[in-house]
């Protein structure tokens, strides 16, 4: 899962949206640095990552990547799941339009920015103003996201080419998303993530 899915599942679970978004920017034990609700959100994010990576649908999808891009498949798929969530938001969350949800999520996250790591602050400078969560529905934007990640981290250069794997298996990936994401939504609503 990437930013949008983590925020969405956190909302359904009544967990800290801030903690769920912040988690990738925090190493080790967060308990000394953040309030309990944010810590709980960080831990939820980490559980979701482990759960998602071990889902049979996701393990199967990783195998569709070519040998030269398979190493970055987990990252590429996380971004792709956000694409499908953004694209199908009105079906999955009909009572909370995506643009309204993005505004709500931004308000929640802004409360912790003053005490956040610089890289997280930098992310927030772009995430909201450039409407990333809404733009995830556009595959051209997904390609830009993957290229941007590859540019910032040269060891992940294979992300550029992983775009072709997404394109080649788009329909099958969308089917897998529909197989597992509604289950995760139900788990979040039951606070079972």
From Swiss-Prot:
GO molecular function, one term: [acyl-carrier-protein] phosphodiesterase activity
Gene Ontology BP terms: fatty acid biosynthetic process
Purpose: Converts holo-ACP to apo-ACP by hydrolytic cleavage of the phosphopantetheine prosthetic group from ACP.
Coiled coil segments of this chain: none
HAMAP family (alphabetical): AcpH
Enzyme kind, highest EC tier: hydrolase
Keyword Lipid biosynthesis part of the UniProt annotation: yes
Protein's recorded name: Acyl carrier protein phosphodiesterase
Membrane-spanning parts: none
Reaction catalysis annotation: holo-[ACP] + H2O = apo-[ACP] + (R)-4'-phosphopantetheine + H(+)
Organism this protein belongs to: Escherichia coli (strain K12)
Pfam families, A to Z: ACP_PD
Family note: Belongs to the AcpH family.
The EC number(s) this enzyme carries: 3.1.4.14
Protein's gene: acpH
Superkingdom field: Bacteria
Keywords, sorted A to Z: Fatty acid biosynthesis, Fatty acid metabolism, Hydrolase, Lipid biosynthesis, Lipid metabolism
